[in-house]
Amino acid sequence: TSSGTGLMEGAVRSCTAKRAAIFSVGAFGDKWYKIATGNGVPSDIFKSELGQPTTPEMVDAALSTGKYDTICITHNETSTGVQNPVEEIAEVLKKYPDVVWCMDAVSSAAGSRIETDRLGVDVLVTSTQKALALPPGMAVCTLSQKAYERTASVPNRGCYFDLRSIYDTIQKKDYQYTNTPCVSIMYAMDLQLQRIMQEG
């Protein structure tokens, strides 16, 4: 129960054991950096020129230093309309199998094709109020096995957005969560996903 920003915080805080490389093409990329630094997560920001995407070369140059174990990228930057070339970035990330990839897809998930598993995205964050066409108030994310395993090496994951704690609770107890869920939006999303599947 939060906006997408909450799970962005959960992603970078739960998955960064060493240092995060944050790639910004606008306001929401800058938000990744603000979240990381506000939570004491060591991080560096790599900005593109206004209206330009994060390039695979930028990602490769940063990761080749060996300083980073997490990268944060905005898929579709609402403030500029730039959509990052995630297919090409995914190819670069194959060279760095230990790096956890966190993606803000708040304004694109359910509106753009994002093959999370094929691309190798470890944590994809979205929320209900954009392409899912639901009221705001609930964020959802994917969590890869690699990202889950990484969380074990991060000592200060926080409480409310501790992805490991949330995942473990859901796996152990049906219909139980670490915090009070937004049940009304969960029902609405269930219906909306059924409608999407029927339409194809």
Functional labels for PLM-detected ranges:
Residues T1-A21, V25, G29-Y33:
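Conserved beta-loop-alpha segment that forms the PLP phosphate-binding cup at the N-terminus of a helix
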Residues D117-Q129:
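Conserved active-site segment immediately N-terminal to the catalytic lysine
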Residues P53-S108, V123:
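Active-site phosphate-binding strand-loop segment of PLP-dependent enzymes
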Residues D30-K31, Q52-P56, D60, T78-Q83, ...:
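Short, well-ordered, mixed-charge alpha-helical segments that flank or form enzyme active sites
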Residues K31-P42:
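Active-site-proximal loop->helix
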Residues T1, I45-F46, C72-I73, W101-A105, ...:
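General beta-strand structural signal in soluble alpha/beta enzymes
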Residues Q129-G200:
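Active-site C-terminal subdomain of aminotransferase-like
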